[in-house]
Amino acid sequence: MTVDTDKQTLGFQTEVKQLLQLMIHSLYSNKEIFLRELVSNAADAADKLRFEALVKPELLEGSGELRIRVDFDKEARTVTIDDNGIGMSREDAVSHLGTIAKSGTADFLKHLSGDQKKDANLIGQFGVGFYSAFIVADQVDVYSRRAGLPASDGVHWSSRGEGEFEVASVDKPERGTRIVLHLKDGEDSFADGWTLRNILKKYSDHIGLPIEMRKEHYGEDADKPAEPEWEVVNRASALWTRPKSEIKDEEYQEFYKHVAHDAGNPLAWSHNKVEGKLDYTSLLFVPGRAPFDLYHRDSAKGLKLYVQRVFIMDQAEQFLPLYLRFIKGVVDSADLSLNVSREILQSGPVVDSMKSALTKRALDMLEKLAKDKPDDYATFWRNFGQALKEGPAEDYANREKVAGLLRFSSTHDTTGAQSVALADYVGRMTEGQDKLYYLTGESYAQIKDSPHLEVFRKKGIEVLLLTDRIDEWLMSYLTEFDSKSFVDVARGDLDLGKLDSEEDKKAQEEVAKSKEGLASRIKAALGDDVAEVRVSHRLTDSPAILAIGQGDLGLQMRQLLEASGQAVPETKPVFEFNPAHPLIEKLDAEQDMDRFGDLSRVLFDQAALAAGDSLKDPAGYVRRLNKLLLELSA
């Protein structure tokens, strides 16, 4: 390699200096992750070369034996990671090593918590793994040449991690990238063969590429041979190609960390080989925590796709539906072409068949997790439950299966935890109950004592309490479970079916008929603010309630539309009153039309507040309430 030419000094992307300092100081107890990250990057570089060489075999430059080499020099106090993968051009080095992938600097800084374990988990997720080199090194030199470029187009990138980096042109006969870490004072322990081998065994044994280290000689053989001898220190076989019986849990966990760029362990995994009409192997993982961008439209999602063990692409979204975008893993197919493109993957019988099978496999994995490890499933639900709730709308074929995985709060559990499965609810249904009842609202605290629940509590009927913003939208697609219909207890004219006796129904009709005059008076007082006024069959303790019209949008859907800037259709609630309540009896007896109007309006506003809605005229409500209080105290 010749001396540097055409040298430039450039500044890091804004905030990278701060980022480096934060990483160095917040991750000092997890120093060994630098090797995991750099080896993982080297493996990715080999995958990219394999893929590009499918179309341009000349990129292999006569050498298709890909490998990673890790070396050290005790005297020089250096550690070197060398690969013969795709390599970088000068422009690549400036853009890839001078800025942060995904423009993620600000997000990374925002998510650093001071908890070293959590912060270590963020490194790969934000595409900043290269910078972990500065945890142990006070200077990093990178020598690289992109495959296909002449030897004279090599690049030397160098930085001390202090806000600037130098880049220069060098001759580099071999393609690929060599990273030389100049260890800080006190980090000499990493310039040791035994230490490096242990770290590689711990973090990188699953890498499907040979990782080589120089063979060390001791005793009588201590004289080094003229040419270094290299030995493979990892298994160097793709984990998913090995029999399941030979793979330890720890190996699956380390492979997950590599493929998902996550330092935490997965909650579950499913490893399957399919043979028959289609031949493919899949290894799917359920992460232990949600990525920061799970609900971002352009977030990374999809499986790593291999064809006959040749890497094709990251983030192949075509093999799982969007609601399962949190699933990580690999799929290795023998039925797809090596030159498959994202466009080709958009449709076709092979892809469609694989997607259907992989979706079922992922849902089966979640069912098993829920059955065998309910505490882990509760963790999964906290992280990914809202994504899974998109399933009934997106995946009609698996709607019932997805519904069985959903969890809700209910009146059965006073903790408010989303722990009730629909199958559990069905198992607790009372005699004569043929419907599944639910109520939506902004929070458990807001709806747990809702007047809409009064008649259900009286009859001992469980009601699901749906408090996620997505829930009302979900229920517009999830209309039944186990052949039983869902009923919103706040919507329409409540009909409890067999839960009300014929005598009850007849009595309700008689009361409604006897109070038609009162209903007309209240409707006149409330005017166009209500669609209808009627006697309520929902109430036992409260004086009044607002019901949603059968075809109208509820509060959650209105808020969703408003938040997205869409027009919200005007709707009017139905005012229902409890004829047995003392306030309604007093209202019925009131002859003063002004007082009747004020009391009707106060009851209407209170019902709106109980439903979680805001008042159109809060000052008017306070004025009327104060007036009535003064009259009562006179």
From Swiss-Prot:
GO biological process per UniProt: DNA damage response; protein folding; response to heat
UniProt similarity note: Belongs to the heat shock protein 90 family.
Assembly and binders: Homodimer.
Role of this protein: Molecular chaperone. Has ATPase activity.
Region feature (A): 1-342
Gene designation: htpG
Record-linked SMART domains: HATPase_c
Listed InterPro entries: HATPase_C_sf (IPR036890), Heat_shock_protein_90_CS (IPR019805), HSP90_C (IPR037196), Hsp90_fam (IPR001404), Hsp90_N (IPR020575), Ribosomal_Su5_D2-typ_SF (IPR020568)
Protein name as annotated: Chaperone protein HtpG
UniProt region (B), positions on chain: 343-559
Keywords attached to this entry: ATP-binding, Chaperone, Cytoplasm, Nucleotide-binding, Stress response
GO terms for cellular component: cytosol
Pfam family name, one: HSP90
Record carries keyword Transit peptide: no
Native source organism of the sequence: Xanthomonas campestris pv. campestris (strain ATCC 33913 / DSM 3586 / NCPPB 528 / LMG 568 / P 25)
Location of the protein in the cell: Cytoplasm
Renumbered residue ranges of the record's region C: 560-634
GO molecular function: ATP binding; ATP hydrolysis activity; ATP-dependent protein folding chaperone; unfolded protein binding
